[in-house]
């Protein structure tokens, strides 16, 4: 298996949250095809309720790549994604007390109830459910594991541990995720942010803890300081696989350097437009 086959690319969702950055329609489709050629395991896009462009049929009809559509935990949003034909549905809710109480003004019991309702809706439609645990890095283990257990019991495929504010350090990532991995009833995915320049290092720590799914973006673009860079994930996850499995070498036949370089050119062009739109400092 190629290293990128364990990566969910979120360039078209989290990446496009970079201030001033917007991809043209032809760029979005080009990125879809190039990321497929590059060998990523899945791509993530915003749901039609958030971005109407996602309702176009070419996004939901992909046969050889999982297109995971990201939704708020709102049944009406999920319904729009299902009607558009998507079979891989992601739903996200906060699990930290700070976000539950101060951001949403609800209780953890409400979060669990909403999660169960949303997953059941997805599964009843015959689609696969993926769950995001927003601000998991600042949540208690108790809250996270209760949330994960309910997700597993209700039929979710995988749960994303999100370091939403990018506050974790590698030592903490490895120790905490190793502990959670031992008790989590479904596969874990790590989603790091780069606020302190540690996103890629944190993903490597997560890999060392036994987490085999990761999310990242082309050139590490995203909100605030961005996410883990896709090229960095390709190189380091490949090296990690070789190191942890003596005699094993990543299958680079499933990776296209040409395709990845082409995605970077598209993203760089969009970044240049964003720089001019909001006058952000930019380094090529």
Predicted regions and their residues:
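Catalytic cores and adjacent flexible loops of soluble metabolic enzymes
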Residues: 1-284
């Amino acid at each position: 298996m190629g290293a990128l086959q364990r990566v969910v690319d979120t360039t078209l969702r989290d990446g496009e949250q970079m201030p001033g950055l917007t991809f043209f329609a032809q760029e979005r489709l080009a990125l879809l095809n190039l990321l497929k050629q590059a060998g990523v395991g899945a791509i993530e896009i915003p749901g039609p309720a958030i971005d109407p462009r996602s309702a176009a049929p070419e996004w939901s009809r992909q046969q050889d790549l999982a297109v995971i559509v990201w939704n708020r935990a709102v049944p009406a949003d999920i319904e729009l994604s299902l009607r558009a034909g998507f079979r891989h549905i992601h739903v996200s809710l906060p699990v930290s007390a700070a976000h539950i109480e101060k951001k949403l003004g609800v209780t953890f019991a409400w979060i669990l109830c909403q999660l169960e309702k949303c997953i059941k809706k997805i599964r009843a439609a015959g689609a696969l459910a993926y769950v995001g645990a927003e601000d998991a890095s600042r949540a208690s283990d108790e809250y996270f594991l209760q949330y994960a257990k309910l997700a597993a019991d209700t039929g979710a495929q995988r749960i994303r541990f999100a370091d939403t504010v990018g506050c974790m350090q590698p030592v903490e990532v490895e120790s905490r995720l190793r502990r959670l991995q031992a008790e989590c009833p479904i596969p874990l995915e790590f989603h790091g942010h780069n606020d302190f320049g540690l996103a890629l290092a944190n993903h490597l720590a997560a890999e060392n803890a036994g987490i085999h799914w990761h999310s990242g973006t082309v050139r590490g673009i995203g909100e605030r300081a961005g996410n883990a860079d896709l090229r960095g994930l390709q190189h380091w996850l490949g090296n990690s696989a070789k190191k942890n499995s003596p005699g094993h070498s990543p299958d680079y036949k499933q990776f296209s350097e040409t395709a990845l370089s082409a995605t970077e050119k598209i993203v760089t062009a969009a970044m240049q437009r964003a720089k001019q739109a909001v006058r952000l400092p930019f380094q090529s």
